[in-house]
Amino acid sequence: MLLIREIMHCKPGKVRPMVDKFLAMSKLNEKAGFGKMRVMTDFCGERYWTIVAEFEVASMQAFEAMMQGEGITPKMTKEFEKVMDGYHDLVEWGRREVYKIEG
């Protein structure tokens, strides 16, 4: 089992719109059978305006299939695209972390 973390450092004043996008994405992920996504904002940390979204996958192959949209309908693909439309305008930079869950 793997833990995937999407870490986004938003532009000032753009955290809430990005949180809304991740919360909508979480609902779509559940609807698609991908599981629940946890969405967190920084209380204090390395940088201000940070959002972390994390979820679990069985394997890298499962993650790759999820990222390629395998198993979802064209209608759901459009919903995912609509939710994430314009997110580049909200983010300065980001990164992905992948951890193996040991226990």
How would you name each of these model-derived features?
Residues 94-102:
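Long, low-complexity, Ser/Thr/Gly/Pro-rich intrinsically disordered segments that act as flexible linkers
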